[in-house]
Amino acid sequence: MNNEYKLTKFVQAAGCAAKMGPGDLKQTICHLTPDDERILVGFDTSEDASVYQINESQAIVQTLDFITPVVDDPYIYGQIAAANALSDVFAMGAEVKTAMNIVGFDRKNIPKDALEMILDGGNSKIKECGGVLLGGHTIESPEMYYGLSVTGMIHPNEIIRNNTPKIGHVLVLTKPIGMGILTTAIKRDLLELNLIKDCAKIMASLNYLPSKMMRKYEVSSCTDITGFGLMGHALECTNNSITLNISHNDVPFVKEAFDFASNDVIPGGTRRNMKYVEDKIEFLPNVSDIYKALLCDAQTSGGLLIAMKKDDAKEFIKELEDYSFGYASIIGEVIPRTHKAIIIN
């Protein structure tokens, strides 16, 4: 792992922890009302990507995402940023077709050869899922950021939404949480190299395989977990008819993230998430403040949160384990609406 460039030292916040908080974002875009009957999925429902119908059998899925460095290795940072951007297409159940680079380059602190490695890392992930890089746009910036604009394709009848989970379905999370806390620890030089490598491997792994595998089953909803944390994105999956009942002990997380959170190594994005969800979620008394921070932790390139039948979920998890994707767990269930959108027990 190449740490000589110290990419994380020249940014205020790492990765998706730099994301604008969900409350502020909603206020900012609420007046934007695109009107076109071919828009199958817009930004009015907090979906992962937008979908625009081309004809009876084809729709394009569009998204973009870019992040500041979460690790110091340029190539791995490029991989993580690309995996994070591509994930929105996978969450919709779509296939990636093309991508374009989005770059803000900090020429003052970062050498040009590091940028070449970042772009190579990103391109490796685009190729891994069968996509093609078509170009991009680069500006000079006081802070480094990199990501992708991504276009995918899907049949209009096969779109997987995030806010349609069925009562009786269970919730599967495919990656452990805690990455916001751990990338903050990286930025503060608190993490040992072996743990940095483990975190980087998790963040750089694509959600492509879980996305392809879940399509074999009856999936009622799916989203990916990124800057708003598990709780923020789970809230986007709720509606007036259902409540998500989640067991905090069943949520996979990286152990060291708990330890760092206990020592107040908590990113600002995570604190904003905690503030946003506090009146929307019931945390039962057995859920500690440290677990609350973990559940709200701002993830970068997190896993998929999928609602599906319990028997299917068990088979799905076993399939992922067979492909060495061993973090997936059933973390809760969808129940009829109670007094809160989410209950954490």
UniProtKB/Swiss-Prot annotation:
Binding site for Mg(2+): D48, D88, D224
Family matches, as InterPro entries: PurM-like_C_dom (IPR010918), PurM-like_C_sf (IPR036676), PurM-like_N (IPR016188), PurM-like_N_sf (IPR036921), SelD_I (IPR023061), SPS/SelD (IPR004536)
Gene3D superfamilies in UniProt: PurM-like C-terminal domain, PurM-like, N-terminal domain
Enzyme Commission (EC) number: 2.7.9.3
A Gene Ontology BP annotation from the UniProt entry: selenocysteine biosynthetic process
GO MF assignments: ATP binding; magnesium ion binding; selenide, water dikinase activity
Enzyme class per UniProt: transferase
Keyword Transmembrane: no
Record function comment: Synthesizes selenophosphate from selenide and ATP.
Name this polypeptide is given: Selenide, water dikinase
Originating organism: Aliarcobacter butzleri (strain RM4018) (Arcobacter butzleri)
